[in-house]
Amino acid sequence: MRVITVKNDIEGGKIAFTLLEEKMKAGAQTLGLATGSSPITFYEEIVKSNLDFSNMVSINLDEYVGIAASNDQSYSYFMHKHLFDAKPFKENNLPNGLAKDLKEEIKRYDAVINANPIDFQILGIGRNGHIGFNEPGTPFDITTHVVDLAPSTIEANSRFFNSIDDVPKQALSMGIGSIMKSKTIVLVAYGIEKAEAIASMIKGPITEDMPASILQKHDDVVIIVDEAAASKL
């Protein structure tokens, strides 16, 4: 694990972008993408760049269950707003939150991931240590699955909705087992509210109670944090 401390999320986005650029020059074909506020500056750097993604595949970590892709709170909408509309890919993949048969959707998404090994995975981290929507207690070897969102996650995401009652209670998420197969993982985290999770992830025991702690076992992980998020290291 390599930890890089930056002044702010703008600098963090630039460093994450530089790491991506290096991997693309080395032949990266598939990007694993995350949503939430942490990776936004990374996407802004991509949009400003001259990088061409027309021959590349993207695979997103997760999507809410029960929300249409056209809904402005869906992760599909988020990705189009922050990246896809400006930088077209050969193929974009997200779980279908409106799939009638979630078991079949899980099989479909696992097949997509298996057919497109992820070269570069961008991650955020939840206050409770979740990566993707893999909440505490999630088995480390799990692949795509339906998640019942933790109350802390629902509360954290409620700022994007009119009311906490509007926040979906379930999501489809790429599993930790799939995330760990990514060749390179870059995790970005900013703000004091992430400090406890960052410290536990890096210094604590490897335990399913802290999903991100499994990253200690990965061969190529870069953690980009501002001083606040790094304050308990």
UniProtKB/Swiss-Prot annotation:
The keyword Transmembrane helix does not apply. Pathway: Amino-sugar metabolism; N-acetylneuraminate degradation; D-fructose 6-phosphate from N-acetylneuraminate: step 5/5. PROSITE patterns: GLC_GALNAC_ISOMERASE. The active site is at D62 (proton acceptor), N128 (for ring-opening step), H130 (proton acceptor), E135 (for ring-opening step). Keywords: Carbohydrate metabolism, Hydrolase. GO terms for biological process: carbohydrate metabolic process; glucosamine catabolic process; N-acetylglucosamine catabolic process; N-acetylneuraminate catabolic process. Gene3D superfamilies: 3.40.50.1360. GO terms for cellular component: cytoplasm. Its EC number is 3.5.99.6. Pfam families: Glucosamine_iso. InterPro entries: Glc/Gal-6P_isomerase, Glucosamine6P_isomerase, Glucosamine6P_isomerase_CS, NagB/RpiA_transferase-like. Catalyzes the reversible isomerization-deamination of glucosamine 6-phosphate (GlcN6P) to form fructose 6-phosphate (Fru6P) and ammonium ion. This is Glucosamine-6-phosphate deaminase. It comes from Streptococcus agalactiae serotype V (strain ATCC BAA-611 / 2603 V/R). The gene is nagB.
